[in-house]
């Protein structure tokens, strides 16, 4: 009985060195050969699982090393692809193309918001580039395993729509600022035109004044004064001496004249006349 128990304990060991629980009375009826076959099958499955896991880990490590080395070398490493892998690639989906188009639109709007001059030329150039890229996307084939980052296209589109709305509001504000700047530029241009007209009028007036001044200078050089002619009545009128002789009370007239000459008003007038003569001589 003791030997039988020892041999049954050895039979309970599996191929990978593990132990199996002792069977119950109901399982003992099947016999020792069926127990051995069950333990061997379980060990093979576990070994296969370990092998698959190790292969998957190695594959992931190799892909990580390839991607890291390509990033360090500036994506200069060439990866050889088999024809079977390339044939399994499929064209880019419509949702992915729409998402990429929305990304390009938001990028174009952000560039135009930052641009201060030549916006029309920049916009035309960017739109041409976008059309060329979209044409390439229609025939572009991509691997299926590399599209995991585009699974959440809807959420990305919502975010891009929000960004587009923000860019549109910024464009509206920018357009209002442009309109205000155009109005101020028009007002400035009107002011400039009015000032130019005033300058032309002042120039014409200055030319007329210069002509008059040159004419007076020429007349001053000849030392001839073009004075208006005296009226004939002034030439035919009697002189002051004749009028004085015609006065009967000449003695009283002389006294009045002496009084006038000695008065302060008369002296001031004589001084004024002398100064006028001095200035005329200087001219």
Swiss-Prot record:
Polar residues bias spans: 26-37
InterPro entries from the UniProt entry: CAD_CENP-Q (IPR025212)
Segments for region (Disordered): 1-87
Keyword entries, A-Z: Centromere, Chromosome, Coiled coil, Nucleus
Subcellular location as annotated: Nucleus; Chromosome, Centromere
Compositionally biased region (Basic and acidic residues): 10-19
One of the record's GO cellular component terms: nucleus
Coiled coil: 159-224
Gene Ontology biological process terms in this record: metaphase chromosome alignment; positive regulation of protein localization to kinetochore
Primary residence: nucleus
Database matches in Pfam families: CENP-Q (PF13094)
The keyword Coiled coil is assigned to this record: yes
Job of this protein: Probable component of a centromeric complex involved in assembly of kinetochore proteins, mitotic progression and chromosome segregation. May play an important role in chromosome congression and in the recruitment of CENP-O complex (which comprises CENPO, CENPP, CENPQ and CENPU), CENPE and PLK1 to the kinetochores.
PANTHER family to which the protein is assigned, alphabetical: CENTROMERE PROTEIN Q
Family to which the UniProt record says this protein belongs: Belongs to the CENP-Q/OKP1 family.
Protein name (Swiss-Prot/TrEMBL): Centromere protein Q
Organism: Gallus gallus (Chicken)
């Amino acid at each position: 009985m003791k030997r039988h128990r020892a041999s049954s304990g050895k039979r309970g060991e599996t191929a990978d060195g593990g132990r199996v629980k002792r069977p119950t009375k109901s399982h003992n009826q099947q016999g020792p050969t069926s127990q051995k076959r069950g333990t061997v099958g379980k060990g093979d499955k576990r070994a296969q699982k370990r092998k698959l896991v190790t292969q998957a880990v190695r594959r992931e490590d190799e892909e990580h090393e390839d991607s890291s080395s390509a990033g360090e070398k500036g994506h200069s490493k060439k990866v050889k692809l088999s024809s079977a892998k390339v044939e399994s690639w499929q064209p880019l989906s419509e949702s992915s193309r729409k998402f990429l188009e929305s990304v390009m639109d938001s990028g174009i709007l952000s560039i135009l918001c930052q641009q201060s001059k030549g916006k029309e030329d920049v916009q035309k150039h960017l739109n041409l580039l976008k059309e060329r890229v979209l044409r390439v996307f229609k025939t572009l084939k991509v691997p299926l395993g590399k599209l995991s980052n585009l699974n959440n296209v809807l959420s990305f589109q919502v975010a891009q729509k929000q960004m587009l709305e923000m860019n549109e509001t910024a464009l509206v504000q920018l357009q209002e600022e442009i309109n205000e700047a155009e109005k101020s530029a028009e007002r400035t241009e009107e002011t400039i035109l009015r000032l130019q007209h005033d300058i032309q009028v002042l120039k014409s007036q200055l030319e007329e004044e210069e002509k008059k001044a040159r004419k007076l200078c020429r007349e001053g050089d000849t030392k001839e004064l073009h004075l208006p002619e005296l009226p004939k009545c002034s030439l035919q009128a009697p002189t002051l001496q004749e009028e004085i002789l015609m006065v009967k009370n000449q003695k009283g007239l002389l006294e009045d004249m002496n009084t006038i000459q000695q008065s302060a008003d008369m002296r001031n007038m004589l001084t004024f006349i002398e100064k006028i003569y001095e200035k005329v001589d200087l001219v």
